[in-house]
């Protein structure tokens, strides 16, 4: 009984012929068509294309997805005729196929690949490269081979240029939301502090305008600043700095300054 990995390994054994017919490739001389085992790569490539179309706003989305599903079914039929088993297209994706190329017992890297992940350069030569990194082909050719070989194929799912714009928009909205909340709270705090300062100044001014202050008819208590001194701790309890007022009234320094 064949497994998905058996099918993938068979395809890898024939991978040097999967780009045929191509007169420019020496291994394709006399080869009129690619081996049917290469249908595995067709399905993997179609799965990537399907993933991109699934998250687009293009008006042709439904039509494209329908055609892709039909193409996948054709290759699935080919594989069914070869191996006599029903393979799920979801099992034939680049990031799942790469698991089949490692020896389960020794951990040795399998096939023609020097890395445990399907190397992009090798797949590119076969015409079956996975979805490129964000930035498309420009970024793909700009990065050194050593860097590309350290990036798992599965990461392409999240670095896909077709859907990355949505993640960037969401991130931008979150940043703007946080910035708005911080600015709003700061302005509210300043406005509230300003109103309290105005209220305090008005209170002092009203007290200083008492016509009977320092006379026998003085309406103030023995300490003319008693009410004000009692009020300062109230504002300090709310987090305000009352250093200037404490100094003016001859009081010791307080908190929040």
Curated annotation (Swiss-Prot):
Membrane topology: Multi-pass membrane protein
Transmembrane residue ranges: 123-143, 163-183
Primary location recorded for the protein, binned into one broad class: host cell
Keywords: Host membrane, Late protein, Membrane, Transmembrane, Transmembrane helix, Virion
GO annotation, cellular component aspect: host cell membrane; membrane; virion component
Induction: Expressed in the late phase of the viral replicative cycle.
Locations listed in the record: Host membrane; Virion
Name listed for the protein in its UniProt record: Transmembrane protein C257L
